[in-house]
A protein has these predicted regions:
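Sequence signature of WD/YWTD-type beta-propeller architectures
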Residues: 29-384
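N-terminal secretory signal peptides that target proteins for export/translocation
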Residues: 1-12
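Bacterial N-terminal signal peptides
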Residues: 16-25
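Short, surface-exposed loop and linker segments with low hydrophobicity and enrichment for Pro/Ser/Thr
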Residues: 14-17, 361-362
Length: 384
């Protein structure tokens, strides 16, 4: 609210008003940050279901679309590409995307780019009608597209990998690894592999089960949280060579609640050991770690890895965004208690809530999906 006396022609009245406002906090002046929220660098005014930055800063995103058939109301997301110069191209018209004779709906859950920035892996959550009674079956599938919208057919076959979640390319831009459900629903996963030119093949880590797995940037290896199939033993942090069966156990975890994330340099890893505490660990010296009490949420690393940007809610749920400074990692002796810090949370974007967010690869921009209509907005990355 702007003070009614702020524009008075009497200087003494303006000064008195200013002093009174400071004392009682009754009036405020719009801040630069508020103006910035009204003027994003980019506004994609659509119902966004997922998005991801390409290595060069382009954005692939999916848009919620419904259409009717004679028997069913179906959902088939469109997929679009936002070019750096401002141009937008539709890569996939969802209504025209079909497989087999059974009706199905899908939403895009996530995207992953190839290292060369030319191919896109779209993880689809599908619901298929499997009989005349209307019984349905849910599954994960991965669709392969190039950045021109052409479907990429594996070994001249289909462009869809069935039963494939959290897919990613290896550094050769040819091999793909993904997760298949080993214990439903999404409790444990096995690793499956395919190549664009030859098709699927047995993973070197066949028979092992994982709670989570992420590739290391620029390497043919991954960090995984392994759990035995019976789920009776502890979770173990492993480094896997994805081209062989070689592996290195990094640590036995006190707990695992999700959120596995590898830092941009590939030198650190972070994850929640329970619903409150985040553990950050050095991958070169796994006994060097830190614990922070920040509450369960979704986070991304700052470019310099000195802090994280945390959305204080679960994935696909709305929450506010806060910066969390990371403490130095220190050596911890096995069997000794690990100290837990309680860092301050620095709110950004006026504490508004967002459904999804991502930091651009160059660390300059922040993309957010707003709560409600779910438009995609891009701002300069707020520092504080």
């Amino acid at each position: 609210m702007t003070c009614p006396c702020a524009h008075s022609r009497f200087r003494w009245l303006r000064q008195f008003c200013s002093m009174l406002c400071v004392l009682v906090g009754c009036c405020s002046v719009p801040t630069r940050g508020a103006q910035d929220l009204d003027k994003p660098l980019l506004n994609i005014d659509e119902d966004i279901t997922a998005f991801a930055y390409a290595p060069d800063g382009r954005i692939v995103y999916s848009v919620h679309r419904n259409f009717k058939t004679k028997l069913y109301d179906l959902e088939h997301d469109d997929i679009w590409l936002q070019e750096a110069g401002g141009k937008r191209r539709r890569l996939l018209e969802g209504q025209k995307f079909n497989r087999g004779n059974l009706p199905f709906s899908y939403i895009v859950n996530s995207f992953r780019w190839s290292p060369n920035g030319r191919m896109i892996l779209a993880e689809l959550l599908t619901t298929t009608v499997i009989d005349d009674s209307g019984k349905t079956q849910d599954s994960f599938q991965t669709l392969l597209l190039d950045d021109g919208g052409k479907e990429i057919r594996i070994a001249k076959g289909d462009s869809v990998i069935p039963d494939a979640a959290d897919p990613f390319f290896l550094s050769d831009n040819l091999s793909i690894n993904c997760l298949a459900e080993a214990v439903k629903p999404r409790m444990l996963f096995s690793l499956k592999a395919t190549r664009l030119n030859t098709g699927s093949f047995q993973s070197p880590h066949e028979g092992r089960t994982f709670r989570d797995l992420l590739p290391l940037p620029g390497a043919n290896s991954a960090i995984a949280v392994e759990q035995d199939h019976s789920q009776t033993g502890p979770s173990r942090l492993q480094r896997l060579d994805l081209l062989s069966d070689e592996h290195q156990e990094l640590a036995t975890l006190d707990g695992y609640e999700g959120g596995l994330s590898v830092s941009p340099s590939g030198k650190k890893v972070a994850y929640f050991i329970d619903k409150e505490i985040l553990e950050v660990r050095d991958l070169a010296s796994p006994d060097h770690l830190a614990r922070l009490r920040i509450g369960l949420g979704v986070f991304h690393w700052s470019p310099d890895e000195s802090r994280i940007l945390l959305k204080r809610s679960l994935e696909k749920k709305s929450g506010d965004l806060v910066w969390i400074d990371l403490p130095p990692l220190s050596a911890v002796t096995l069997g000794h208690a690990v100290p837990v810090s309680q860092p301050s949370a620095i709110s950004i974007l006026h504490g508004l809530t967002f459904r999804d967010f991502a930091i651009s690869p160059d660390g300059r921009f922040l993309a957010v999906v707003i709560t409600g209509k779910r438009s995609l907005l891009v701002f300069p990355l707020p520092q504080r």
